[in-house]
Design a protein with these regions (language model features):
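Hydrophobic, aromatic-enriched alpha-helical segments typical of multi-pass transmembrane helices
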Residues: 1-201
Length: 201
């Protein structure tokens, strides 16, 4: 393995990303819980399912690393077989990563809907997040459903780069710079409570 240190660093970076994603999922749960507790919980569970899938999927890279660096394995099966097996596990990791995006797509689809009805952020950002979720769905499912996926791989990857990623980036920047508009949600809740209070009186 020519760059073992870089390979190990990439595994650690993935692990850090997974842990951060769990924290983000929990934060969104508490943010959207007042809007709809059940849907917010469902979105968080999908996020955790994605994190669990990605965490297990890291084992593929660790096994590949052992095959490429462990003299015992090379001696047992031969260098060519060890390299072939390592490549197989790296390919399996790539497939597992794409399948995990199904859970991510479900999570941000629900979050996009809840953000839309809550008006915590401008609705255009919520719509873009929903569109991003559909893009992730299409990308992930196409890798399994399409026999000739390689012929369309470039198109799906371009959709991620120019649709899904900008939508996520815009929402993240808005939340970091502007935050959420809790006043709009509070006003909406007040309006919804007024008819009930009028009836009780």
């Amino acid at each position: 393995l020519a760059a073992e240190g870089l390979f190990r660093a990439s595994i650690l970076a993935d692990l850090a990303m997974i842990m951060a994603d769990v924290a983000i999922g929990v934060a969104f749960y508490y943010l959207l819980k007042p809007v709809n507790q059940k849907l917010s919980l469902l979105a968080a569970l999908f996020r955790l399912a994605q994190a669990a899938t990605l965490g297990i999927n890291l084992l593929m890279l660790l096994i590949a690393l052992q095959l490429l660096t462990g003299d015992l394995y090379t001696a047992a099966v031969g260098p060519e077989a060890a390299n072939a097996l390592a490549y197989l596990f790296i390919v399996a990791h790539d497939i597992g990563y794409k399948l995990a995006l199904v859970f991510f797509a479900c999570s941000i689809l629900i979050q996009g809907y809840l953000l839309y009805i809550s008006r915590y952020v401008p609705r255009i950002l919520s719509v873009l997040l929903i569109v991003a979720s559909l893009t992730y769905f299409a990308y992930s499912l196409a890798t399994v459903a399409l026999v000739n996926y390689d012929a369309y791989a470039g198109m799906f990857e371009m959709a991620l780069v120019f649709i899904a990623l900008p939508a996520e980036l815009l929402l993240a920047l808005w939340l970091l710079i502007k935050g959420v508009n809790l006043e709009v949600s509070e006003q909406r809740n007040t309006v919804e409570q007024m008819p009930a209070e009028a009836l009780s009186n």
